[in-house]
Amino acid sequence: MRQKHYLEAAARGLHDSCPGQARYLLWAYTSSHDDKSTFEETCPYCFQLLVLDNSRVRLKPKARLTPKIQKLLNREARNYTLSFKEAKMVKKFKDSKSVLLITCKTCNRTVKHHGKSRSFVSTLKSNPATPTSKLSLKTPERRTANPNHDMSGSKGKSPASVFRTPTSGQSVSTCSSKNTSKTKKHFSQLKMLLSQNESQKIPKVDFRNFLSSLKGGLLK
């Protein structure tokens, strides 16, 4: 395998300077092996590297879906019996393949590379290699606390310390209620202090004090 990659790299390097030597290297490797394996992007007849300058590429598409073929496919899907001629037409449509035609300009020969048929593609879609059920991630299940396990592990502890452990939501609610009660208490204390100061600054005015103030004003 390493020799094959090395010879292919050497042939590509000698393609512009010495194309004959490059073709000889590719031919020497293919002739020395029994499997008759050819290189990619290489003409199997003259061992010329198939590049844009010395090759012509064409694509022969698959057979098109005609209204008649569509009608036969619908009948087949409904489990209707088809005649021999109709079944042959449907089979030919399903087995049709796209063909890539590469013509070498050096030897003027064409190499065909066949694609996959419609039936093969449909089987791949219906039976994928990796099913979707395996790819779906499982959600982690919550573990429920076992009361027997808690009782066995909490020997020597009081029941209050075992079963009265507050959760995070309960602790947050208790802390918030304590804070609100403290603020209300401070507000009431401040209000009482302000009312006491106002009462000390303003003297009490009764009827006796009013008469004494009038008397003092008349004497003056």
UniProtKB/Swiss-Prot annotation:
The modification Phosphoserine is found at S126. The modification Phosphothreonine is found at T130, T139. PANTHER family: UPF0711 PROTEIN C18ORF21 (PTHR31402:SF2). Belongs to the UPF0711 family. It comes from Homo sapiens. The lineage of its organism: Eukaryota, Metazoa, Chordata, Craniata, Vertebrata. This is UPF0711 protein C18orf21. Residues 171-180 have a biased composition (Low complexity). Keywords: Phosphoprotein. The keyword Signal does not apply. The gene is C18orf21. InterPro entries: DUF4674. It comes from the Eukaryota. Residues 117-181 are annotated as: Disordered. Residues 119-136 have a biased composition (Polar residues).
